Amino acid sequence: MVLSTAINKFMYLTVQERFGNTFRVGYSRTELAENRQAIQHPIVRACLEELGIEKGLEIVSIADIPSKTGLGSSSSFTVGLLHALHALQGHSVSAQRLADQACQIEIHRLREPIGKQDQYIAAYGGFQLIQFQPNGEVFVDPVVWSRATRLELQRRLILFFTGITRDAREILSRQTETTCNHLTELCHLCQIARQMRDVLTSGKDLNDFGRLLHDAWEIKKGLEITISNSRIDDCYQRALKAGALGGKLLGAGDGGFLLFFCEPHHQDRLREALADLVEVPFSFESQGSKVIYVGDDRG
């Protein structure tokens, strides 16, 4: 179980039919492939296979945030590409199906050692309590809270980029291998997720959210030694001394973005303490993946 939110940092994808069966795929590099099987980008190739598309396409992606930074860009890419391909075929698709299909591709087809959180929040958007069942089912429960609480929480959250990028697969593989050794800690993290949701929905002292964020980070660090490192620990301690009540490293660990909960009157001091990091302004995003435009000349 996790408490998760979408933010206003986006992955943009365009899909355009090409003459013949050749593909042009643009991301951090550009591929020109003679057919679907020759595409090197594993997610693009797998999405095309999943939907049975062989006719040539031009697929281009642009992202607000770099990859390998813990904000779910890979799964957002998968969800967005599936959504665009379904639209190209003239199909409307639900958030549930998008998330399920993205998980099928990343976890089962590509054997990535990842969970399902990123795919579901990318598809649904909003602020969600996401529950993962032993049988593979996923339940997405929106947090029902007041506009005032939402705005106040946003005022108290500050996001910093550490400048460190990393491949999450190795970290997540090790975490998966040791899961059975940390069932008590994982159950505690689930309880904290519920408590954090309750703080938001009940109108209780919002600072409790920050304290729970700190508790969850301390537990998560104990799950696997590579989740944090000396640089991350130093930044975190500096933030606490500057007035932050809690925080966490987003994503699998070892780099990416640090999120802190800090009351407004301490935030200037927090920014000074972490002047070596890059602050990234953000806001909560209520919508998940959406199709912005579909041309009239398809087919």
Regions found by a protein language model. Name each.
Residues 4-53, 62, 85-113, 117-247, ...:
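C-terminal nucleotide
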Residues 62-85, 243-258:
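Glycine/serine-rich anion-binding loops at beta->alpha junctions
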